[in-house]
């Protein structure tokens, strides 16, 4: 499966931005038809969809689109963009599972990624994630979320810490991937720090609004396969000696961490050697 570490929102009708996005290295490119595309430009953005998705795929990215809620102009968005065969359809401002079921009916046969942008949506995350079998992930917003909470966005992101942790837990419990909120400031250092915080919490994917951040954030979310191999080797050696724990880089390695390292290697197409049997 192609990597999905970074999900870049791109203005729907800005052809220069479309070309820049194709060069930036983000894994998933999203033609954004909501906030990034003023209503007068949406017809133009819809007309660009088909050729745009082909160009993005030729550049090695997954081609996605974010449509407006169906109760506004989302159905008009879908009627146009589905002809371009996007790989993924995202929908903004999903607060309840009923919206997902309506989207699934309106967009048959394509992967769905609902976007959670309000307190109500956050409280319904588990139900939203289980609303349809074609849901590949959920994405949590930043700007709309802080507005709904009645606060403001900061570089440190303290105001969203609980939201991001709660969202990840709900998604994990539902068995779907969680895409972290974008860092909406321009500085690269802050973007990397924000991505590292998300990675430490357990996120494996992050949304972006600045294409210049893509390569650095990709590095943060690229699995450390070398360390996974060391973990497996050390634990297997310990197990062969009759122990159920080992140490790697000073860290205690027990069965859950060992099992996660094996899964990581298998998912990367580098299966570890067969498990050694414990002595005795």
Per-segment meaning from a language model:
Residues 1-280:
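Expand to "…catalyze enediolate/carbanion chemistry for C-C bond making/breaking, isomerization
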